[in-house]
């Protein structure tokens, strides 16, 4: 407040003259005495925040703009108009709500809020809820202006924990309008740019348009958009990308200057913006409206004050908003994932026709670029093949069992009813949200790593829910496209969390295998779950010994090449090649362990790149040796039984090298091709199989080593985010004449300001962003070199694999009771190859059963 000027009868006067008119206004400066009052101008109608009316312009208050310049600081003047009303002049210097790096594009930070009005509003149930008109420039772009959900944006300052949202009397627009919610879609984001956000948001809006186009549906139709709510949860106000904020402003969802830091002495935990938008913006920053088939979409934008990780974002979705909307189906999408045009409908249909389905997921596709240009990168091609075969073999098999080990958080759906805890607060969501508290210091290392894959815990808790009989389903008709890592460092970092989380979560599900018997599943389903547990246990053991198994295959094949009747190399050349490769192999394994113990992949990008190249060359040599040994074995068998066709066939069958290799190859690569044809999606076989084969040794020797050597890394990067900011303003209440608590807030209400702000947001999207240069801070650099030593797990893993290798290849007498070297090598190689064949056969049979079930049950 300005101080009193005692030289003028103690009347409240500013100690300095008010700033000049803006350049577009013209005229003289405004001395305080020239202010005129007009109480007859009606205030703009607010959106009703409750049936009894809660937010309004007080009829005794007179709104007057304070003309400010760009360099002013926050201050205010209150004058009495002589009629019991007040005139408050506010001079506020406002900053963009979003933070983020300065070199990622210009957000509307220029001081366009020359006109701000102090508005006296009643608190809604003790909460700050504001309704503000959207810019008229925005309304010119859209068709419908008949209801306040289209013409006003609603802001709510949440000051509670997500679990207390309903108890603190917060309401959403859908509650006030009496609408039922069939689909509740959440988009979680951190600092993704406008391209990634628009890719996802535009895809979601296309799906809503498709739902409205289904005229013969009993659920959907032209007004189907009223049954869909899209919730955008951004993890941290200072983390959100400013250009993404510009997109939301251009869609009418977000307005700068509305948010506050503290309400009634309580820090704001989330800023909630609600608007029914009629505009969609694609990844090329093209605006699309009704003329492009865009239907209205109810948007709920939750901007969290602090960065508290993704699982906390899901708490806001499930615990804060879910109980108010009580949706039927919840869809989870990560910003950056583009859902197919009808994918959300197909996911919803799974729940509609199968009443026992608790969760479902679609296919995750790798984005390959225009004309598949990204497939030229072997790293992208190998991941494309991996994703495809997982969606053709693994997910269908698990869907047949009824338990999908993980529904990917990037694109999945859950039945809201199935997620609910029991009356004692125990259930799937309780176990799921425990992950929010599982920092390294708060839990043992096993539990902390397990909750790196909290979605796996949720999946198991759903199917094992006490007294229920829920199953999980894979929907092959639904898909979401996402970017995959295209650099070695990014790839290794991503897989570290995936591998560690899935490894420990897999152990959790097997340790708690008996929980399914307390569910309401029938005996047949429980037996199927037990079989799946055994299948997963076998795979888990295989993954534990994967590095030893691959080394043994390399060792046996490269030493056996010299013992065939017609070796490919001159005398001793094969032995020299084997010795060189063997020493390099062991040396690189040791180097990797040393690097992984104290460094991030970003610090040793070229070292990892050269290691991957070496393993690709090694794989090529192993394949050559395998092919040569097999061909020579066939020749020998044929020559042994030249004149008898039956004898030739029997000789081939008895030829160990031929039989085992052929069975293993047929059970993998031929099954890959056949199953892909059955799913009408074989193209990845031709474009990505070869890169996958040559990258497979790196999956085993590089990813596993880095993951196991970093089991201590369970941080989420949110430490220290405990302060309360006040840059947005503080709201305090006073009692009004009717005894109801009221607050005074300064808001941008003039259309001139709203339009200028809106134009700036749109103009910002037309300016190409400056390429972002990633920099490491001092703390990260220090953590790269100083990581604690995780002795027990890594030591056990290394020793167990060394024992396995030693037993097979060592020729000392101590191992003779296992048989001589050739016998041990032959038996073990046969075991490995037949195990691969058996696991592949199970996956293939599961894939076929899934297709049959899809035909008859949908």
From Swiss-Prot:
One of its GO terms (cellular component) is plasma membrane. InterPro entries: Chitin_synth, Chitin_synth_fun, Chitin_synth_N, Glyco_trans_2-like, Nucleotide-diphossugar_trans. It holds the Pfam family Chitin_synth_1N. It catalyses: [(1->4)-N-acetyl-beta-D-glucosaminyl](n) + UDP-N-acetyl-alpha-D-glucosamine = [(1->4)-N-acetyl-beta-D-glucosaminyl](n+1) + UDP + H(+). Its EC number is 2.4.1.16. It is found in: Cell membrane. It is an enzyme of class 2 (transferase). It comes from the Eukaryota. Residues 1-15 have a biased composition (Low complexity). It is a multi-pass membrane protein. The chain crosses the membrane at residues 537-557, 576-596, 609-629, 661-680, 685-707, 791-811, 831-851. GO terms for molecular function: chitin synthase activity. Residues 1-63 are annotated as: Disordered. One of its GO terms (biological process) is chitin biosynthetic process. Keywords: Cell membrane, Cell wall biogenesis/degradation, Glycosyltransferase, Membrane, Transferase, Transmembrane, Transmembrane helix. Polymerizes chitin, a structural polymer of the cell wall and septum, by transferring the sugar moiety of UDP-GlcNAc to the non-reducing end of the growing chitin polymer. Belongs to the chitin synthase family. This is Chitin synthase 1.
